[in-house]
């Protein structure tokens, strides 16, 4: 019996917002996945400044995902004492899900940088990639990178189209600091949690 097709969606999620959910939904439907696992990073190697605690980010993800049975959140990276790298996470998840097909989900911006990641070239050969188009990266540049990685590393890449949504976690943090409206950019449960815990101020 064939295993499940599971997408791995890592990030800071600082905080999780509607753009993350749209990206995951598009990847889920277009790549015909059975499940998407959100994996918040404990110590993002490239985002050390302004990252709130893993407990807050994990709880916000749980609240944001509770309506979606096909989505789950894992604390696998929180259990490490060292910075979290995608390659290490994929290695661990392959051991945890030996009978399933794992896919790594990334945006167009991540795809442009992936060969510079820790063991990024090996990652391309280890797991199929679901690459999602994203505002800020032109379609031509995105598709050229897809073709380059396929040719250079024989990477398996599934291209997913996504509506342009100009939402980022940094935008939300900025709006909170500047006391501008932001509730329309995140799930209501996440908004309530941020307010209740006085985060990002």
Curated annotation (Swiss-Prot):
Q: What does this protein do?
A: Catalyzes the reversible adenylation of nicotinate mononucleotide (NaMN) to nicotinic acid adenine dinucleotide (NaAD).
Return the EC number. 2.7.7.18
Full protein name: Probable nicotinate-nucleotide adenylyltransferase
Family named by the database record: Belongs to the NadD family.
| Catalytic activity from the UniProt record | nicotinate beta-D-ribonucleotide + ATP + H(+) = deamido-NAD(+) + diphosphate
Which source organism does the UniProt entry give?
A: Carboxydothermus hydrogenoformans (strain ATCC BAA-161 / DSM 6008 / Z-2901)
Q: Which residue spans traverse the membrane?
A: none
Q: Per the record, a Pfam family? A: CTP_transf_like
Keywords of this entry? ATP-binding, NAD, Nucleotide-binding, Nucleotidyltransferase, Pyridine nucleotide biosynthesis, Transferase
């Amino acid at each position: 019996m064939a295993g499940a097709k599971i997408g791995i969606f890592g990030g800071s999620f600082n905080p999780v917002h509607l753009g993350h959910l749209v990206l995951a939904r598009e990847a889920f439907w277009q790549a015909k996945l059975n499940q998407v696992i959100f994996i918040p990073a404990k110590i993002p190697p490239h985002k050390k400044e302004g990252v709130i605690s893993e407990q807050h980010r994990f709880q916000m993800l749980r609240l944001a995902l509770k309506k979606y049975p096909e989505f789950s959140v894992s604390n696998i990276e929180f259990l490490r004492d060292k910075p979290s790298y995608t390659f290490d996470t994929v290695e661990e998840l392959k051991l945890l899900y030996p009978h399933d097909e794992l896919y790594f989900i990334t945006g167009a911006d991540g795809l442009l940088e992936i060969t510079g990641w820790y063991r990024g070239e090996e990652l391309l050969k280890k797991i199929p990639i679901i690459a999602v188009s994203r505002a800020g990266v032109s379609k031509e540049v995105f598709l050229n990178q897809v073709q380059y990685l396929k040719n250079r590393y024989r990477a398996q890449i599934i291209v997913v189209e996504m509506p342009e949504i100009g939402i980022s976690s940094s935008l939300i943090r900025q709006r909170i600091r500047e006391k501008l409206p932001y509730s329309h950019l995140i799930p209501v449960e996440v908004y309530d949690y941020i307010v209740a815990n006085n985060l990002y101020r």
